[in-house]
Amino acid sequence: MNKKKLLSIAIALLLGASSTFAQKQPVDYVNPLMGTDSKISLSNGNTYPAIALPWGMNFWMPQTGKMGDGWAYTYASDKIRGFKQTHQPSPWINDYGQFSIMPMTKQLKIDQDSRASWFSHKAEKATPYYYSVYLSEYDMTTEIAPTERCAYFRFTFPETSDAYVVVDAFDRGSYVKVIPEENKIVGYTTRNSGGVPQNFKNYFVIEFDKPFTFNKVWADYHLVETHLELQSNHVGAAIGFSTKKGEQVHAKVASSFISPEQAELNLKEIGNKTFEQTKEAGRKAWNNVLGRIKVEDSDENRMRTFYSCLYRSVLFPRMFYEVNGKGETVHYSPYNGEIRSGYMFTDTGFWDTFRCLFPFVNLIYPSMGEKMQEGLLNTYLESGFFPEWASPGHRGCMVGNNSASVVADAFMKNVTKADAEKMYEGLLKGANSVHPKVSTTGRRGYEYYNKLGYVPYDVKINENAARTLEYAYDDWCIYRMGEKLGRPAEELDVYKKRSQNYRNLFDPETKLMRGKNSDGTFQTPFNPFKWGDAFTEGNSWHYTWSVFHDVQGLVDLMGGKKMFVSMLDSVLNLPPVFDDSYYGGVIHEIREMEIANMGNYAHGNQPIQHMIYLYNYAGEPWKAQYWLRETMNRLYLPTPDGYCGDEDNGQTSAWYVFTALGFYPVCPGSNEYVMGAPYFKKATITLENGKKLEISAPKNNDDNRYIRSLNYNGKNYTKNYLNHFDLLKGGRLVFDMDNKPNKGRGINESDFPYSFSRDAK
């Protein structure tokens, strides 16, 4: 063979390898185990591997924790107790409607401890659309491929006459029935952690493709010999097979919050598909969603981090609706227990996700955002209030009235197609009342706030300063929406004035926000490093920046841009000192700030996540460009310890996605995104309207992190923000990056992002 021919073959092989590498798709970069190495005292994400489709009604997960444990999967665990259908948004909120399936061989073991099998991450494969693990105790493999409301299981058994599958419907009221002639198990679970009506049930159906050689039901881990149907506090089923070596047994699983019949209907999502076809359909669904944003980088870890964060950004809020036999969208109402028409979504806390998760959906996936807004309207119609934390119904968690932000942002961006007047009515209701049973829904302390302009420190309402600051922003959101709707001026003026209530807590002596008593005096003594008390999971240094809608007003209160920048610098330069006396010990959020090595900047919790972007409002955008990259480099990794605190239903992930693209919605409702700097050399967003937005930064790297200049659609662009409706037109942003800050760019007030005070002048 001559040298020329050898060279041709070598080139062909190289091209083939290059082509194979190029065929790697977005979902291939996702690590569902990112953030799973967590515990109650330290959160590296507090996530679990959600085996699901985007926004799916049901997720599946390997269960390592005990029944009812919020930390249901932890990376440090070495035993699996079952494979659980889960709807858990957070370990702190816990789960509802859960049940589990556990295969085994040799001896039938029902108890959750005795049935657990050793496993290794080396024999575990986790992707969003497919999960596989070898259970060493039983010499068998379990595989799962999900749909939105179903899952396809494939069990590969050894040769044995003692192959079993145990179904656990969990405690606190459950039902199960084995139907041997149909190779089927049906049942329901009522297990929940609150936020459900009295008639709440999750009905399930499991169909196997192999006849049973053994079938029993059980109660409280004891087999029942006399019948195959049982309802009690804690029941389940056990079925068995004889299998050859390598034989695969399949199970199709569906569930419904509506009825057993609807659970059977939901099985149609799998229909006649094989396991492999279901798996491939899931892969395609994920690539369709993740592929809306294409980033390019030679560092695979950055690609993995980006797409793992994007995956987390499209899980919640989850669908809580189904499709009936007539093809109509219907839902079980977690608010009144009725079956209603239309969409419903749940499992999100607006205190976290109003900040950038919902704006992200509104920009990249507006048709899904439209459905979510209809779901919010249905929540108001069915319960009298918008949710603040829903799982599946109203939950007593966190502070604020941030449904106003979620509703207003979608409306201002023309995402909402639901009855906007009715939604505005709901905002007014929530701003001037409190839910009779769930005081975190609506506004706790609204009477004081409306009268005094703040929630006082001395009236036994906890976290009062945090409430005041968030209520003021929420009032601005109501004002914005009302203005666009053409509401009466006298009505708008109420919320316009209230939006300035943040000023009532500003202490000119310390230049920080501070709790205030009902007589108008500031709380004393005052320690700005004290967590909790007047604030929520943070201190005054963190919450002072919660003036999303009027940063210029805050700049003015502090004495001008120079002092404002100095105060921002202080957060990042101060040591991570803290006062934990309010909690009586170090909470995990404090520990996560302490170990991050970024001063008093607590990125692991939401109140401060927008802070670095505020340099853009004071003429020093290069500091934002520096610190945003530091945050991404230091605090995010595509590993089990990859987050710097609770991931929180997409918020902390969507922060990374936005920031990596180079912009962030500091003030939802303003239709603006504040500039950072792109993280990748190239990113392409395919918008839902078919337009493409290309973000190019050819010289971008860790040294060249500063924007020297920006060319936007062929023109020099100096502003520190981008407009939502301009982005929807598509186009090209070309960044010239440098290793030195350009201190002459973005320094004029005309370049600064929206602030109410400046806009009102």
Positions of PLM-derived features:
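ATP-dependent phospho-/nucleotidyl transfer catalytic cores
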Residues: 474
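Bacterial Sec-dependent N-terminal signal peptides
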Residues: 1-23
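Extracellular attachment/recognition segments
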Residues: 706
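Accessory carbohydrate-recognition regions in carbohydrate-active enzymes
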Residues: 23-358, 362-405, 411-469, 477, ...
